[in-house]
Amino acid sequence: AGGINTILRSILDKDDEVVLIAPFFGEYVFYVEHQTGVSKIATCDENWLPDIASLEETIGPRTRAVIINSPNNPTGVIYPKESIAAVAAAIQRAEEKHGTEIYLISDEPYRKLIYTDAPYPFIFEHHPRSIVATSHSKDLGLAGERIGYVAVNPNDPGKADLLDALNFSL
């Protein structure tokens, strides 16, 4: 919660939009509203993976971020590399169309709680403006604690300004 709020505080201006892919952790809507943003909802497909056509329809000129959550809460689905790549490609097409910069934010509190051989893709390989937020409240059994971190893609051309904003917003 703290990491996502810090990220949104750093990148959103009033009425900027954040795209959430349903189903999603319900608190995201409140995090966006708390930072004076607007949540826009894209859908998933029948396999609980992001529906790219819905995502492309939902991203607009005021979109500043797309939040993904994998393994997903509440479905438990792990987004495969192909889905992450497709989401990133849709974001990049929207950036070109609207002349904007859009962050791909990956909320990963369940990343270390995968009990299959499914590989876990790393988003930094797919989009330069990507940010990872995670918490140790799940993997270390620290329910209610707010201990985690935010990682910024080292290939983000605006990483210095973003890191300054993240530090300032704490």
PLM regions and their residue ranges:
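Conserved core of the PLP fold type I
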Residues: 1-96, 111-126, 131
